[in-house]
Amino acid sequence: MITRRNSLALGTALGAAGLATPALAQQRPLANLPSTMVWSVYDVGSAGYVEASAISDALGRAHGTRVRLQPSGTSIGRILPLRQRRASHAWLANELYFAAEGIYEYATPDWGPQDFRVLMGRRNAFSVVATRESGITKPEDLKGKRMAWVPANSSVNIKVMPVLAFAGLTLDDVELVQFPSYVASLRALIEGRADCAGAAVNTAVLRELEASPRGISWVQLDPGNERGWEAMRGVVSFAEPIAETVGSGVSANNPANVMGYRYPMITVNADTSEDEVYALMKAVDESFALYKDVNATMPRWAMSEAGTPPMDAAFHPGAIRYLREKDQWSADTQAWQDGMIRRNDALRAAWAEFMPGARGQAPEAFAAAWNERRTAVLGSIS
């Protein structure tokens, strides 16, 4: 269900896309597709919220499905409703990886590695952005430079580290300059208080950097550098090459070779009905024409793109069934899936063994002990 608040956020885009015509409003039932759903999503105004709104609107028009969007500005605020089954689906970014691995805010006795699965997810692009005057264009140029850093922004920080690893660098090789927020860290480049920062390529505030005298430059990650990409995937499993053409400082004629990741990813509990997941995959795929023109990134929800790995968690069996029918499930994809299942199973088993002796520890000691155990487990299955 698109509420009045949702409609205000979406009205212009959906109207411009021509989605309100009577011909497109004809509805037909789809077997096993729930008549009502609750989706936990990013805050109102975010890209994730707009995309969830557009797709839920399309499902309503095509099948009469009513979707209530439940926005939250925090990682826990999006994942907790899914875990507690107050939401049927969560539209997540890298907090899915954190929850599946039991790291950062999920390295606490109340959480640990979670058993979630994905349906599909849109490709997004990330790298380290720099001022053009800094001369930074590749990972090795980052050594000794002033990097804007937000200590509490785990989802950005975890993607900066693999960019450094591409050139064999770590956080010790850069000068970290702390800022209170993501936007503040990017404005620091405009103000000359930092040389570089981690950022999604389509971040709106970077248009200001692009237009400023300092100019904009992206750290390019050579897609042919196998050693560099292997080093990146040693830090995070979800990294993939992408030639980004949408965003600040890039275009179809001037793409940036950067790190691809998924945002948002449609996520469910592992034990969600296979038939329901299959039905939602089919509905999202077959209603693609109703939402693909809402903005420049919506075409990336095409199943041929959004139904491929890597993701931050393994695919749900219902999603796999649909992808097989679409002839989109290869031997390589199955090998990736098997590895992700093995990884999650090993981490959850290790957590079950770890917890009895770890309860009662101070939070920092608990997290440190679990991270040590997690590192050992992942080393044993690699």
Locations of regions flagged by a protein language model:
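Short, glycine-/small- and polar/acidic-enriched structural segments
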Residues: 26-166, 177, 218
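Pocket-lining segment of extracytoplasmic ligand-binding domains
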Residues: 94-96, 104-106, 134, 171-172, ...
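N-terminal export signals
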Residues: 6-25
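An extracytoplasmic/periplasmic, membrane-proximal ligand-sensing/linker region
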Residues: 34, 201-214, 218, 275-277, ...
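Sec/Tat-exported extracytoplasmic proteins
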Residues: 59-63, 86, 132, 146, ...
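C-terminal segment of N-terminal export signals and the immediately downstream linker at the start
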Residues: 1, 21-35, 223
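Ligand-binding clefts/hinges and TM-proximal coupling segments of bilobed small-molecule sensing domains
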Residues: 146-162, 238-305, 311
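Extracytoplasmic/secreted proteins, especially bacterial periplasmic and envelope-associated proteins
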Residues: 47-54, 58, 77, 81, ...
